[in-house]
A protein has these predicted regions:
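Terminal C-lobe "cap" of eukaryotic-type protein kinase domains
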Residues: 2-22
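Short domain-boundary/entry signatures in modular proteins, especially
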Residues: 15-24, 51-60
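Short cysteine-rich clusters marking metal-coordination/redox-active sites
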Residues: 24-28, 43-49
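N-terminal beta-hairpin/loop module of FHA
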Residues: 53-95
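Asparagine-centered strand-capping/turn motif at beta-strand->loop junctions
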Residues: 102-106
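Short, solvent-exposed loop/linker segments at beta-strand-coil boundaries, enriched for Pro/Gly
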Residues: 108-111
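C-terminal boundary/linker segments immediately following FHA domains
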Residues: 113-164
Length: 164
């Protein structure tokens, strides 16, 4: 019976995951990510102001990226219990307004994989744009991907006809 009970480490990991899943939007919305509204393209929106969250996934877990969000050591680094050390920031590109990226503020070097096949090391102070098809490999070597649903031309034409 004892082996069926969650260990202290299991409980701590669960609490850290719950803390990372809790969202506080600038508009005043507070809640877990399941309360965000799913969009057709795979993104999520704040139910109060419509702020868009982009899902970065490793196949099992996801990190929701949006302007002003932070990534923590428990998500990107070597310590799965550290929910206090910031390792990444979601920031707007200074030259291209409306384009956001993940800025590395950790001591480690990340690796970015771009949709066109380019690979780039991302040291402290550098970043990778949040583009559909991009991937990032954090310090531990785990690859996280952003894959949104592409609208087909036929579907887009149908939507255009409905709005006319």
């Amino acid at each position: 019976l004892r082996e069926l009970r969650p260990t202290e480490v299991d409980w701590k990991q669960l609490l850290v995951r719950m803390a990372m899943d809790y969202k506080s939007c600038h508009c005043g919305f507070h809640g877990f990510s399941y309360r965000l509204l799913p969009k057709e393209n795979g993104t999520f929106a704040c139910p109060k102001c419509g702020k868009i969250y982009y899902p970065l996934t490793n196949g099992m877990d996801r990190i929701l990226l949006a302007e002003g969000e932070k990534l923590y050591e428990c998500q990107t680094g070597r310590n799965p219990m550290d929910k206090d050390t910031v390792t990444g920031l979601i920031v707007e590109n200074r030259q291209k307004k409306g384009l956001y990226g993940i800025k590395n503020v950790s001591q480690g070097v990340w690796r970015g994989f771009y949709p066109d096949g380019k690979i780039k090391d991302i040291p402290n102070g550098q970043g990778i744009p949040i583009w559909n098809g991009m991937s990032v490999r954090f310090e531990l070597g785990e690859e996280w991907n952003l894959r949104l649903v592409q609208q087909t031309e036929e579907r887009k034409e149908d939507e255009d006809e409905q709005t006319v």
